[in-house]
Amino acid sequence: MRTQVGIVGAGPAGLTLARLLEREGIDTVVVEARSRSYIEQRVRAGVLEQGTVDLLDDAGVGQRMRAEGLVHHGIVLQVDGERHRLAMSDLTGGRTIVVYGQQELVKDLVAARLASGLRLRFDTECTDLVDLDTDRPRALLREADGTSSELECDLVIGADGFHGVSRQLVAAGSQVFERDYPFAWLGVLAQVAPSCDELIYARHANGFALHSLRSPTISRLYLQCTPDEDLDAWSDGQIWDELQTRLGVSGWTLAEGPILEKGVTPMRSVVAEPMRHGRLLLAGDAGHIVPPTGAKGLNLAIADVAILAPRIIDFLRRSESSGLDDYSDVALRRVWRAQDFSNEMTLMLHSNPDRFEDKRQQARLRYVVSSEAAQRSIAENYVGLQLA
Ligand code: DHB
């Protein structure tokens, strides 16, 4: 097979990039190691920044997101059992976020690609990327039945996530910056109407808890746990009890329902600099991951491809390579802003085994809920700074 741009990974980054390039008449092939049903079902993030929503709309894949996504104008911060609403839209000149599950967005992008009759290979693993320093890089592929093939390209985009082959190849020649956190999230998806119209980020002596949602009938809830937490040690009843404790305020109870899905989300910050090796460019989690607090991961993936798409087009149409040369620097400025924000939100909201840090972060959270200046800073980062 041959194409102009080979895209490894059919997550939000790879599929959105393919869509942006399709609109400009650039030929792409997307290969994905997993099955279609796997990527369309897996429960991931759910908060889209205004800029992400606008980009998806402009790319012609926003109809269902606009119809079914839930627009939010504020979030709630809970400290010492008291709730404080952070009026995001009022603090940011009217900007909002939209709650819409990542897997719903993936479904929309897959449907759009297939409707355009364009190449998208599921169950096709990229085992290696070779000749990256030549003008004919190749992706070596293996299908589920063991058949091998090759995809020859002008450029390869590594959008195959944190565990993919692209990140490993780039990391070998890049600087990698990392930070581990002494916590993780136990997340559940529950078949019950959300108990509050807005997201609640709660700090409690037992640990952080988050009330989120996916639809008027589905709640998404998280509990701070340890990185090596044994999920099997938690019964559904214990999960609900702990959520009630950490999210509880007087006069309010969390509605409970069947748990549809549960998992443990690790927390790490990782950045590869530069996000490039020859003709391989990284986008999304392949290049960087952030801890989940503040919901920046998916939004960064979309921001990467918004920065990358016009640079690829200039390169392929006019042999103009300066855009590709500065892609990493431009994208990483936003990535580091998000690393700082996600790190700050994570530390401020989680109970910390370091007792000094724990006290300091409690003081910070109390300051935030009492200061409009501090709230404005969180709000503008939360709704998303301008793309690029
Ligand atoms: C969700 C995840 C986040 O990391 C966050 O900060 C808010 C909401 C969610 O999955 O709904």
Model features per residue range: what roles?
Residues 295, 310-388:
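C-terminal helical "tail/cap" subdomain of flavin- and related membrane-associated enzymes
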Residues 41-44, 49-116, 339:
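Active-site-adjacent segment of FAD-dependent monooxygenases/related oxidoreductases
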Residues 22-43:
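Glycine-rich FAD pyrophosphate-binding loop
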Residues 266-282:
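FAD-binding beta-loop-beta segment adjacent to the flavin cofactor pocket
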Residues 111, 118, 124-128, 133-263, ...:
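Conserved FAD-binding catalytic core of PHBH/FMO-like flavoproteins
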Residues 1-13:
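Beta1/beta-strand and adjacent pyrophosphate-binding region of the FAD-binding site
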Residues 208, 269-271, 287-298:
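Glycine-rich phosphate/pyrophosphate-binding beta-alpha loops
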